[in-house]
Amino acid sequence: MKSKRKKEIGEILAAYEQIRNDIEKKFRQFENTGSRLNKKEIFRELCFCILTVQSRAENCWKCIELLDNTGLLEKGSFEEISNRLKGVRFHNNKAQRIIEARSSLETLMHLLKQENDSKKIRQWLVKNIKGIGMKEATHFLRNIGLSDDLAILDRHILRKLNKLGIIKKIPESLSPKKYIEIEKRMQKFAKSIDVPASHLDFVFWYQETGRIFK
């Protein structure tokens, strides 16, 4: 069992070396977005994370670009947005979530300018933005360079953590308390192999899919 785990860790480290430069480039892009704090960019990233629930990230980003380029992301009606989300699961619900998120944007922008604690920002997002859970909030913060060492726990990551023995089983659902518990375990593992937890989810995703995205 130990030799198997050692082999898997070796594969993780090898994959990390392969894509480390790409990951660091991504994080520089994320940090640039966060440092600009451009309201339009921030809203685009927030809406992207709303769309990613049970949907392919690449498809979601294409939809965001379409909505953004046509001005519908900020001003489109429910019908206009929904019609352009047909390639995304639960497109009607998510169209409504985008419209609802508009009313919280000014408060969010103020929070991002005033608050340095990423965990507090994540907590606010989960509480105040419909369609945003712990995973989506962490994803959003990562994409604007504010995630620190928080972990995006999607099904790919959870499968990998289970395979490594970091969690005994894959939970059917993740309450905020359970999310933080698993996140801490992942952070501890990441520290033990000298890979930032925020980089590790990229590595796990790459191992599962062969891709690096957002």
What residue spans do the PLM features occupy?
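Alpha-helical ds-nucleic-acid-binding substructure associated with the helix-hairpin-helix region
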Residues: 64-130
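C-terminal accessory module of base-excision DNA glycosylases/AP lyases that mediates lesion recognition
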Residues: 1-32, 113-122, 130-214
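Hydrophobic (often cysteine-bearing) scaffold residues that line and stabilize catalytic clefts
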Residues: 39, 43, 56, 94, ...
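Short, hydrophobic/amphipathic alpha-helical patches that form generic packing surfaces
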Residues: 45-54, 100, 142, 201-209
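Active-site catalytic microenvironments for nucleophilic, acid-base chemistry
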Residues: 53, 66, 104, 143, ...
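Structure-specific DNA junction-binding interface
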Residues: 1-88, 213
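Alpha-helix N-cap and coil->helix boundary residues
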Residues: 58-62, 76, 93, 135, ...
